Amino acid sequence: MAPKRLRIGTRASQLALWQANWTKSELEARYPGIQVELVKIKTMGDKILDVPLAQVGGKGLFVKEIEEAMLRGEIDLAVHSMKDVPTEFPEGLGLVVTTKREDPRDAFISDKVTFSELRQGARIGTSALRRQAQLLKARPDLEMVIIRGNVETRIRKLKEDNLDAVILAAAGLNRLGFTDVVTELLDTDFSIPAIGQGALGLECRLDDNATIEALAFLNHADTAAAVAAERALLKRCEGGCQVPIAAHGTVSGDTLTLVGFIASVDGKQTVRDRISGSTADAVKLGTELADRLLAAGGKAILEDVYQREIAH
């Protein structure tokens, strides 16, 4: 039996509300008569907009207040962009669903110029260190400009901040109907996405069996396996938003292939590798690939990144 009423905790940003409303619609279609309410919660990440994420604590910034509301029993579930979800959950809470992945690629937005046509020294707006590292690896002459804010704000900054291009996740643009502003989609081999990019995660109290059962139909097994492998890699590397780590899993039949990448922020030092195996071993594959990357030079790169952070 599905619960009669469910409260979804969500940030008030356009994209977060789209994600929460999508979940609400899916639940209402599945369980006629169910009451689904959205509860808007302001998070630290919404309040601090003038500082790069890396400097203010990275990943957990967009989920902490929502998780606290869940633990207090004020909401029943939360819908997150998987790329914002830390690898550790507070006691009593957990990820119960990973939805089918939207387009995982990075979108390149410019005034009709493709990445390969960018002028020497072009200024690129992005918030993610992994994007900066991968683009600088390909084009060391580029100037990276850190931009924050919601999707519309970032698109506006292209003109306002006199940038040559901005880079955003394609999934968010697709969900909000901004596909027409995209100049090109960057291949996942060229710009490996963030951990979990394009997938949504549903989190709830682990003792709330009725809610867990009601949400189960939204889980997409292939995406869940791929994202579990990506997150296992991230967890082993102890990386948050503030570290240039990327991973992308794809599933074909029962086989999961995972590509992983660790870099220095300037893109000068990079390690990259891939691993394949059974989807049943997703977490093991992610951990094993992380160990390989760390042994191949990733550990030294990350130690250097952390040292620089401490020096700041």
Swiss-Prot record:
<dbReference type="InterPro" id="IPR000860">
    <property type="entry name" value="HemC"/>
</dbReference>
<comment type="subunit">
    <text>Monomer.</text>
</comment>
<dbReference type="GO" id="GO:0004418">
    <property type="term" value="F:hydroxymethylbilane synthase activity"/>
</dbReference>
<dbReference type="GO" id="GO:0005737">
    <property type="term" value="C:cytoplasm"/>
</dbReference>
<dbReference type="Pfam" id="PF03900">
    <property type="entry name" value="Porphobil_deamC"/>
</dbReference>
<keyword id="KW-0627">Porphyrin biosynthesis</keyword>
<feature type="modified residue" description="S-(dipyrrolylmethanemethyl)cysteine">
    <location>
        <position position="241"/>
    </location>
</feature>
<protein>
    <recommendedName>
        <fullName>Porphobilinogen deaminase</fullName>
        <ecNumber>2.5.1.61</ecNumber>
    </recommendedName>
</protein>
<comment type="similarity">
    <text>Belongs to the HMBS family.</text>
</comment>
<comment type="function">
    <text>Tetrapolymerization of the monopyrrole PBG into the hydroxymethylbilane pre-uroporphyrinogen in several discrete steps.</text>
</comment>
<dbReference type="InterPro" id="IPR022417">
    <property type="entry name" value="Porphobilin_deaminase_N"/>
</dbReference>
<dbReference type="GO" id="GO:0006782">
    <property type="term" value="P:protoporphyrinogen IX biosynthetic process"/>
</dbReference>
<dbReference type="InterPro" id="IPR036803">
    <property type="entry name" value="Porphobilinogen_deaminase_C_sf"/>
</dbReference>
<dbReference type="Pfam" id="PF01379">
    <property type="entry name" value="Porphobil_deam"/>
</dbReference>
<dbReference type="InterPro" id="IPR022418">
    <property type="entry name" value="Porphobilinogen_deaminase_C"/>
</dbReference>
<dbReference type="InterPro" id="IPR022419">
    <property type="entry name" value="Porphobilin_deaminase_cofac_BS"/>
</dbReference>
<keyword id="KW-0808">Transferase</keyword>
<comment type="pathway">
    <text>Porphyrin-containing compound metabolism; protoporphyrin-IX biosynthesis; coproporphyrinogen-III from 5-aminolevulinate: step 2/4.</text>
</comment>
